[in-house]
Amino acid sequence: MKKENEQLEFKKSTGLLKEAVISACAFANKNGGAIYFGIKDNGEVLGQMVSDDTLKNIANTIKLNTEPRLFPTVEEIEIEGKSCIKVTVEESPLKPHTAYGRPYIRVGTSNQQIDQAAYRHYLESRFNGYGFDLSLIHI
């Protein structure tokens, strides 16, 4: 298995779902990416118990804890003969997104909280992209 990078994140289990929500937010705010459950940070494939409820829970947890809401693709895949979960997050035209009320961006293999100046810039870009003549002073 590859190593983690700017578009690839590994989680050994769904017990790390809160961290995965932050990764999903960071990916959406940058170039997109994929989160794999059942793989250690070093790339060792452990596998993951997978049910329809597990897949729905991951999708719903990401959706309910991001703003604007993210709707990732969540699927069971097999890697090295073991069941894992792949969460695919596309780069979002609605960025910046927040996770648990805070904006994040992917930098290398880590998720970094965006500072206020960068967050303001993202917001202005979003509104300007939709043709609004609106500055942050009006929000």
Model region roles, listed by residue range:
Residues 1-137:
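Conserved N-terminal catalytic/coupling substructures associated with nucleotide/phosphate chemistry
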